[in-house]
Design a protein with these regions (language model features):
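Residue(s) in the substrate-gating loop at a strand-loop-helix junction
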Residues: 134
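Alpha-helical segment proximal to the catalytic Tyr-Lys
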Residues: 119, 163-167, 224
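Active-site loop immediately N-terminal to the catalytic Tyr-X3-Lys motif
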Residues: 92, 139-145, 167, 203, ...
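Conserved glycine-rich cofactor-binding loop
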Residues: 16-17
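Active-site helix of classical SDR
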Residues: 114, 150, 158
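Substrate-binding pocket helix/loop in short-chain dehydrogenase/reductase
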Residues: 90-91, 95-100, 185, 196
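C-terminal substrate-recognition "lid" of short-chain dehydrogenase/reductases
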Residues: 126, 204-233
Length: 237
């Protein structure tokens, strides 16, 4: 699916920085036409790139964004639901507003973009949806009750969508990154990060290229028979 002839269109949420920015540039370099979305503007300029300021947890925003993709591009071949927020805190000290904000962005945002994106994919003969979980889910990390719950929900959602969307030739798979040096973990105490890394089978920080390796795999034409799967980076020790 990485052959730019015929033109292939991808939407990446959370595209302004971090993993999303890396993946945007990665797939632009492969000839994809990429629509990136985030709540803020971007400085990325490329002939094959368009940016939409979108709150993925806002249904009207998502419907509008996918509507623009339909109008301008006429198709959607791949959706990478990368947008996410995180907060580490003991369960007893986590405000309801924090838990709600995490669930809305991480889970509801994935739900809404997948729903609207799949409608467009269905019209052009299929596509690939790649959702983002976290190594924290299988590791059951203390201090991440709200965050891990949102990511676990994404895993369950993805398995059901894999079944419901299979008749339309749409695959739905998940990548679960390890901690990567992005804004998402910048304020996490160093000791907490070290404890997390020690619980991985391969105890190191992840790299953007590690994530791209998995998304590349899911996007390969030969991966059309793979759906409902999760690949966790770093391994679970």
């Amino acid at each position: 699916m990485n052959d730019p002839q015929p033109r292939k269109v991808m939407l990446i949420s959370g595209a302004r920085k971090g993993i999303g920015r890396f993946l945007t540039e990665h797939y632009l370099a492969q000839g994809w036409h990429v629509v990136g979305c985030s709540r803020g503007p971007t400085d990325l300029q490329h002939d094959y790139y368009r940016h939409a300021q979108t709150d993925v947890a806002n249904e009207d925003d998502v419907v509008k964004t996918i509507g623009e993709v339909r109008k301008v591009e006429g198709r959607l071949d791949a959706l990478l639901n990368n947008a996410g927020v995180a907060s580490m805190n003991h369960f007893l000290l986590t405000p309801a507003r924090t838990a709600e904000a995490i669930m809305r962005t991480n889970y509801l945002g994935t739900f809404l973009l997948s729903r609207e994106g799949a409608k467009l994919m269905r019209g052009n003969g299929g596509g690939r949806i790649i959702n983002f979980s976290s190594i924290g889910v299988p590791l059951k990390l203390e201090g991440e009750a709200a965050y891990n719950a949102s990511k676990a929900a994404i895993g369950e959602l993805s398995q059901i969508l894999a079944r419901e969307l299979a008749p339309f030739s749409i695959t739905v798979n998940v990548v679960g990154p390890t901690p990567i040096a992005t804004d998402l973990i910048r304020n996490v105490p160093k000791a907490s990060m070290e404890r997390l890394l020690k619980r991985q089978a391969i105890p190191r920080f992840g790299a953007f290229a590690d994530v791209a390796n998995v998304t590349d795999f899911y996007l390969r034409p030969e991966s059309c028979f793979i759906t409902g799967q999760t690949i966790y980076l770093g391994g679970v020790s």
